[in-house]
Amino acid sequence: MESQQLSQHSPISHGSACASVTSKEVHTNQDPLDVSASKTEECEKASTKANSQQTTTPASSAVPENPHHASPQPASVPPPQNGPYPQQCMMTQNQANPSGWSFYGHPSMIPYTPYQMSPMYFPPGPQSQFPQYPSSVGTPLSTPSPESGNTFTDSSSADSDMTSTKKYVRPPPMLTSPNDFPNWVKTYIKFLQNSNLGGIIPTVNGKPVRQITDDELTFLYNTFQIFAPSQFLPTWVKDILSVDYTDIMKILSKSIEKMQSDTQEANDIVTLANLQYNGSTPADAFETKVTNIIDRLNNNGIHINNKVACQLIMRGLSGEYKFLRYTRHRHLNMTVAELFLDIHAIYEEQQGSRNSKPNYRRNLSDEKNDSRSYTNTTKPKVIARNPQKTNNSKSKTARAHNVSTSNNSPSTDNDSISKSTTEPIQLNNKHDLHLGQELTESTVNHTNHSDDELPGHLLLDSGASRTLIRSAHHIHSASSNPDINVVDAQKRNIPINAIGDLQFHFQDNTKTSIKVLHTPNIAYDLLSLNELAAVDITACFTKNVLERSDGTVLAPIVKYGDFYWVSKKYLLPSNISVPTINNVHTSESTRKYPYPFIHRMLAHANAQTIRYSLKNNTITYFNESDVDWSSAIDYQCPDCLIGKSTKHRHIKGSRLKYQNSYEPFQYLHTDIFGPVHNLPNSAPSYFISFTDETTKFRWVYPLHDRREDSILDVFTTILAFIKNQFQASVLVIQMDRGSEYTNRTLHKFLEKNGITPCYTTTADSRAHGVAERLNRTLLDDCRTQLQCSGLPNHLWFSAIEFSTIVRNSLASPKSKKSARQHAGLAGLDISTLLPFGQPVIVNDHNPNSKIHPRGIPGYALHPSRNSYGYIIYLPSLKKTVDTTNYVILQGKESRLDQFNYDALTFDEDLNRLTASYHSFIASNEIQESNDLNIESDHDFQSDIELHPEQPRNVLSKAVSPTDSTPPSTHTEDSKRVSKTNIRAPREVDPNISESNILPSKKRSSTPQISNIESTGSGGMHKLNVPLLAPMSQSNTHESSHASKSKDFRHSDSYSENETNHTNVPISSTGGTNNKTVPQISDQETEKRIIHRSPSIDASPPENNSSHNIVPIKTPTTVSEQNTEESIIADLPLPDLPPESPTEFPDPFKELPPINSRQTNSSLGGIGDSNAYTTINSKKRSLEDNETEIKVSRDTWNTKNMRSLEPPRSKKRIHLIAAVKAVKSIKPIRTTLRYDEAITYNKDIKEKEKYIEAYHKEVNQLLKMKTWDTDEYYDRKEIDPKRVINSMFIFNKKRDGTHKARFVARGDIQHPDTYDSGMQSNTVHHYALMTSLSLALDNNYYITQLDISSAYLYADIKEELYIRPPPHLGMNDKLIRLKKSLYGLKQSGANWYETIKSYLIKQCGMEEVRGWSCVFKNSQVTICLFVDDMILFSKDLNANKKIITTLKKQYDTKIINLGESDNEIQYDILGLEIKYQRGKYMKLGMENSLTEKIPKLNVPLNPKGRKLSAPGQPGLYIDQDELEIDEDEYKEKVHEMQKLIGLASYVGYKFRFDLLYYINTLAQHILFPSRQVLDMTYELIQFMWDTRDKQLIWHKNKPTEPDNKLVAISDASYGNQPYYKSQIGNIYLLNGKVIGGKSTKASLTCTSTTEAEIHAISESVPLLNNLSYLIQELNKKPIIKGLLTDSRSTISIIKSTNEEKFRNRFFGTKAMRLRDEVSGNNLYVYYIETKKNIADVMTKPLPIKTFKLLTNKWIH
C-alpha cells in the first residue's frame, strides 16, 4: 500500500516551496475545503498537463534555469547525506537552516523574488529547471502514516516510489485580489497536500493531524509570502499576521472554517429540498435530521418558516405517509411539530402491526422498519471514550439486531481500508471516497446485504452483550450445539449454531481473542464493545479508533451511514468445517413451553396457582410436564412488579434496636409542620420539632420559612444545646425526604459534624411515626388551647410551646417516667405555671405620665425560656413581653366560666398553687421595677403591633366598678378589678410588621406629652406644626399656649366634642418642677399670639391645629407662619394616606366580643378576615414591614429559634461592628500596567489603541519639557532618596477613548522630597451639588472643560530624578524632573497654586473663602477638580470669554459647551447628569455601575428577582471569632475593600439612601465573616437592581424670593456597638437633596434626646458653611431651617433654663446648639416621624417605609 510505503521513510527532511509527490496519494482525512470533484479533477488535469514533459526526463523542468539553483541529480540516484542542493528553497535532512533562512520560521533576506518561483513567468521548456525533492528515500517532507502497521517494504511499493520522483509539484497561482483569497487558499492547500504536507493542514475541528516542525513552518511561511503578496490579503488575514507574522496555520484554520460553513449551508439547503421518507427509518431519526437542518439554517441567518418547512417535508413523504400531503395542505398555521406528530403516529401504528407477528425470520423490509432498541438486562457495562457516539440509539440498535432471511455462505474477507491517520473516515456510500481514501470491496459473495451495511466490516454495538457473526470462516475452536439462549430486541430467540473464538491481528502486531456466536439469522455481523472492553480494548469515537487503555492505536473505525464499523481485515481466518456448525442443536427445553409465556398467557397468575390448576385439569390442552418450570422459581415479571406494587409491611417494634443501641440524645427524630396561612408577617408560619429516641424529650422551634439557612440555624442550635447541656453528641437524625432536609447545605453540615442522616423511604410515613405523632399531638393541643382561651390565632406557636413544656413533664404510661426525668432534669414546678390565656395585669414601669394607671391587661402564655419571667400577651400594645411583674386577675366569675364547667371557679385553687410565687412578686413590687422586659430575647413574636398608619388603642385606663362591671357583679368589692368582659382580640391586622417580632428599644426617659398623635420621641402626625422659630435674646418670652389634647393611654376618657379644660402634668427633662398647661379650644389657639417661650422644664404644648408655631425668635421681615410654610412647602416629603377616625374603647368594657365556641376548621385555616378595627402604634422604633427581602443568602436570616437553653443576654443592635479599627477603603483598580495593556494583550485592536495612546503621552511629555533632555545622570551618582520610580498606566474612559499616563510612584516617595504642609485641593462635592442646584434654579449655562496634562504645567522646586520611559532603552540612567509629574506628592498642590494664580490674575476670578477650588466673579462660577473645570453662567458668552483666556496658557478642550436648549448629557466627576435648562436635572451613574459592578465577581440576581430594599430590619451580625487562615483573611479583606469602596463612591455621590448600610458595613472590613460578606453582596445586588435610579431635581418656582437651605436630622438611640447611636442628616437646597451623612455618634448617649441633640449639632456647622457658599454664589436672601422629629430636643433648644443637665458633655452640646441656633438665625421646626426622610440614614427600614421616604427624591 502507498501508506505503508510512506511510513518507512526516514525522519522528516525539508525542502523547497515546490516538492515532488508520489504517483498515488492517500489522504488522511476528509477534505476540509470540501472542494467539488469537478474542480479537483480540473486542478489535477492542469497539474498533469503542466508536468507532462517531465515524466521521462528527470532533469526537465517547466521553469527556466536560475543561476541561484543548481541542477538536481536524477531521481533514481539517491542524493548524498549532504547532497549538492544549495538552492535557497530546498533543504535536505542535514541542511535544516540554509543561507537566507533563519531558525524557528523567522525569515531572513530571501535571495530570489516571487516571479522566479512562479511558473507563469517563464513558459515551460525542456531546458528550464524547477526545484524538486530528491529521491523517495530522502523525500524531505514525507509524513509517516501512523496507521501503517507493517515495517517491511515490498518491491512494488519501492518501484512505485522510485517512479514517484519523476513527477513534480505545480505551485499555486499568485494571489491578485483580496476577493480571490478563498479560491486561492484552496489551491494553496492542494499544493501542500501534493507536497506531502497534508498532515499539518488543520482538519474540520481546527487541529492538524500531526505537529508541524520548525523547518516545515519556515517552508509554509515562505511559500505563503511568495504566492500571497501582503497588498492582496484580506483584512482579517492581515490582522492575524499583525499579531504573529508566521501564524499561517491560523489563517488556514479560519479559511477552512469559513468554507466549511458555506458548504454546510449549501448542503443543508439541498438536503432539505430533497427529503424522502417512507417509514423505512425510525420517525424520531427523521425528525431529528430535519430539525437539525432547520436549526442550523436559522442560526446561520437563513430563516425557514413553518409553512415552507412543512411543504418541503410533505413533498418527500411516500408510501403510507403520502396521504398527509393531502390532509395537511389546507392547514395554514400548521407547524413542523404538528406534522411530525402525525408521522410518529403512523410509524408507531406500522411497528405495532409488524411486531404482532412473531417470527424468527423476517423479510428484508422488516430490517428497515424495526425501530425498537436492543435491551439485554444482563449486558455488562459499556466502555467507550465517547458514549454519545456509540451505536446504542433506538434506530441503530434495532437495525443491528434484525434477523436476516438470506442464506449467507461462508466466504473469505479481504477487506482493507487504507488510512494514514486516526481521523474519522466518513463514507456516504460504498463508492464515495474523500481525500483519496480507497475502499476495496470484499471478495466474499454475501447475498442480500442490508442497504446500509458496509460489506467486509463488523458493526460496533454497545448494546449487544455478545458478538455475533454470520460467516463461520473466522471462528476458531468452534463447538457446535451450544446451550445458549440469545434474544433480539423484541425478546425473540435467535438460534445459535456454534460458539468459538474470534481472533484479531491488529496493526500493532498484537493478537487478541474474544468469544463469538455463529448464526445466519442476523442482518449484520455484530462486534460487542462489552466483550472488547473485557480484553482491554475500547472504542474512542473522538479519534475514531480502537485502542488499548495505554493509548496504543489498534485499528481505525469507519463511520458509514448511521453506524460505526471496523474492518474484517484484522480477523484471522480459520479452517473450520462449515457443515459441522450449520447443524443447529435442538434441546429438550425447546420443545417445552417456557414459563414466562404461560405466565403471560394466564393473566400473570403466580406459578403455584398455575401448577395447581394444571394438576387438577382446570386448564386443558397441555399438561404440567409440557411447561419448562426451571425458571419459575426465580422469574421476575416486570409487568407484575409494576402492576402489583405495594408498600412494604411495617414491622411493629422495629425501633427497639435503636432504643437499645443508642444512649440518650444520640438518636433524634425531626419533622416540620406548616405553613399556617392568613397570619401577620411577624407570626411564624412553621415549626420544626425534635424528639429524642431514648428519652422522648421534645423541642420545638418557630420558623418563618423553610429556607436552607433557616433550617441550618435550627440544627446548629439544637446540636449545640445538646452538647453543652447534656454533654452528648448526636449521632443519627431521622427525617423525611423533604427538600429542606435533603438539600446539599444541610447534608454537608451533617457530614462535617459526623452525623448520619437517616431518611425515610418514599411514601413510608409510618416509618416516621415518632415525629409525625408528636406534630399531631401538639396541633391538637394548640387548637384546644386557642379555643379555650379565646386568644387570637397568631399566638398559635405560643400554644405549641406551652404544650411542649407540659408534655415533657408528663409521664409516659409505657416507661412510667416523664421525658424530663429520663433526661435527668427536675420535674416541672406547677406553681410557676399558669393556664394558657390566663388574664393578668402587667405592671407598666414607664408610663407616659404620673397620673396614668400602672397596670396593663394581658394574657399569660407560657414560662419564659430565657429568664425567670413569664411570656404575656398585651392586646392593647399588640405585643408579647417577658416579665415577672404581673398579677393574676381573680374573681368569682372566672375567665373559664364561659365553658359551663358546673359554674366552678378555680381562683382559690390557682391562689393555692401560686402562693409562693405571689409572695415573690409582692416583695418585688416595693421597688421601682424595670422587668417589663421590652428588650427580651423572646423575639419570635415580641412587639407584635398593628399597621402604623392607623392609630393604636392602648388599654391602660383604671376601671371602676360602675363603668366596667356588669349588673350581676356590681356589688362586688370595688377594690377588686372586675374582668367579666376581659376578652383577648381574636385576630390582629394581617399587616403586622415582621420587624416588630423583635423586642423594641427601651423607652426613653425623656419627658413626653401623652397624646394620641405623639410618637415614642414625641412625634406628631401633622407636619405643618412648627415648634421653633429663630431665637432672639432681646425678645424672649414664655408661651402660655396650650392645646386641646387627648391622653395617650386614657384616650377614651374624652369625647371628640369635649370642650372643658383639663390640666395635664408635664414632666421636665433636667429640672424638678412640674407645670400644668390648660387645654384650650382650637379657635382660641389660632387667636393666640406667642410672646414667650416656656422654661426647659416645660414640654412643648400640642395642638391639633396645623398652624401652631412655637418660635424662638420672630423675624422682622417674614411672618413665622409664612416662613414655616415656605421652608416645608417644597421638601420632597412622603405623602401619607389620610387616617380614618379611630375609637378607643374601654379596656375592660369595650373589647370586641369573642365567641369562645367558635372552632377553627384546621390550624392552616387560622386567620379569618373578621379582625376588629386595626389600631396603630406610635413608637418610632416600631416600623411597618410589608415584605421581607426575597433573595436567599446564607446567614441572611433572623435567628428566631427557641429551645430549652438557659437564659442568656443578647445585644440588640443592628449590624453591629465586630472590630474597632477600620482600614482605609481601597478603590477598585481600573487601570492597566504596561504589560497588561501592550505586552501580553491579546486584543489586537485594543492593543493598537493603547500603543497609540502611549506614543501620544510620550510626545506630550517631551512637548511639556517634563524632564531635562540635555543631560542624563548615572544612577550611582544620585542620592537614592531623590530617585522616584515611574511607570505607565493605561485605562479606557467611559466615552471609549484609550488613555496612557506616565506617573511617578508617589506611594513610595521619601518624605524628605516634598513639603508635607502643602495640600492638593479639589472642589468639595457639596460645593458642586450646590452649584448645580443653583444653576437649575437660575437657568445657568453649564460648560465642561478639560485641561490636558494639567500637572505638567506646574514647575517642581525639589531636585528629583526618575528612570527614563522604557522605549528609550536607558535602564541605567536617570533624568531630572522639571515639571510636576502625575503621582508625586507635591504635584497636586503645585498645580493648584498654578491654576489658582492664573484664574485670579488673568481671568479676574476670586476664590470663595472656606471653599477651595470654587472661583467666582460677577458672571461666572468655576468648580475645579484637578484638570476638570465646570463653568456656570447666566450668559454663555461669559463662559466663552473664560475659555479663550484659558487657551492662551493651557491646552484646553471643551467637553460640553452646554449651549443647547434641549436635554444635555454630562459626565461630571463620575456623575451622569441630564440637564434641561429651566426645567429639570437628573443625576445618576447607570452606565458606570453597569460597567463596574460585574467586574466585582459578585453573583447577581441568584434567583432572578430584584431587591426592593438594601436590607431588612432586625438583623444582627454574629460576634463569634473568625476561624480563617491568613491568606483567606487577606483575600476577603481585599474583597470587602473593593465592594465597600465602590459602594462608598456611589453613596456619597448621589445615593444618599444607602449611606447607613455603607457606613455600617464599612466598620466590618476587617471582620469579613460569611454573614458580613452576604450582607455586602445584598447591598451590591440592590445597587445593581437600582442602577438606573436617579436623583431628581426640578426647577424651583420663579416667584420664590429666597433660597431655602434645610437640614433634616434624625438619630437612632443605642443601635451601634458599645451603646453608640447612629445619626443622620440630609441637606436640601430649595427642596432639592444635595447631600447626606450617616455616621456613628462620637459620644455615648444616654437617651434618645441626647442622640437627637448630637445629630442636630453635627448638622449645624455644615449648614452654616453651605449658607455662606450660597450667599456668595447667589445674592438672594437665604432662610435656614432645621427639622427634627424630637420634641424634647426642640424644648431644650428653646429653653433658657441652665440649672441641670445630665452630664457635662450633653450640657455642652445643648448650650452650643442654643447659641448656634440663636446666633445664625436658624429656624427649628418639628417634622413628623413618618415624613422624616433622614430616617433612612439611621436604621434599616422595611420595604414600604423605605420606599415611602425615598420615592419623592430618588427614583
Swiss-Prot record:
What this protein catalyses is: DNA(n) + a 2'-deoxyribonucleoside 5'-triphosphate = DNA(n+1) + diphosphate; Endonucleolytic cleavage to 5'-phosphomonoester
Instruction: List, alphabetically, the CDD domains matched.
Output: RNase_HI_RT_Ty1 (cd09272)
Domain RNase H Ty1/copia-type, first and last residues per copy: 1610-1752
Q: Which InterPro entries match?
A: Aspartic_peptidase_AS, DNA/RNA_pol_sf, Integrase_cat-core, Retrotran_Ty1/copia-like, RNaseH-like_sf, RNaseH_sf, RVT_2, TYA
Indicate where this protein resides in the cell: Cytoplasm; Nucleus
Please list the residue ranges that the record marks as compositionally biased, kind Basic and acidic residues: 1038-1053
Q: List keywords of the entry alphabetically.
A: Aspartyl protease, ATP-binding, Cytoplasm, DNA integration, DNA recombination, DNA-binding, DNA-directed DNA polymerase, Endonuclease, Hydrolase, Magnesium, Metal-binding, Multifunctional enzyme, Nuclease, Nucleotide-binding, Nucleotidyltransferase, Nucleus, Phosphoprotein, Protease, RNA-binding, RNA-directed DNA polymerase, Transferase, Transposable element, Transposition, Viral release from host cell, Virion maturation, Zinc, Zinc-finger
User: What is known about its processing and modification?
Assistant: Initially, virus-like particles (VLPs) are composed of the structural unprocessed proteins Gag and Gag-Pol, and also contain the host initiator methionine tRNA (tRNA(i)-Met) which serves as a primer for minus-strand DNA synthesis, and a dimer of genomic Ty RNA. Processing of the polyproteins occurs within the particle and proceeds by an ordered pathway, called maturation. First, the protease (PR) is released by autocatalytic cleavage of the Gag-Pol polyprotein yielding capsid protein p45 and a Pol-p154 precursor protein.
GO BP terms:
DNA integration; DNA recombination; proteolysis; transposition; viral translational frameshifting
Chief localization: cytoplasm
Annotated positions binding Mg(2+) 1: 671, 736
- The Reverse transcriptase Ty1/copia-type domain is annotated at 1338-1476
Site described as Cleavage, positions? 401-402, 582-583, 1217-1218
- Motif (Bipartite nuclear localization signal) on chain: 1178-1212
UniProt binding sites for Mg(2+) 3: 1610, 1652, 1685
Protein name (Swiss-Prot/TrEMBL)? Transposon Ty1-PL Gag-Pol polyprotein
Q: Which gene encodes it?
A: TY1B-PL
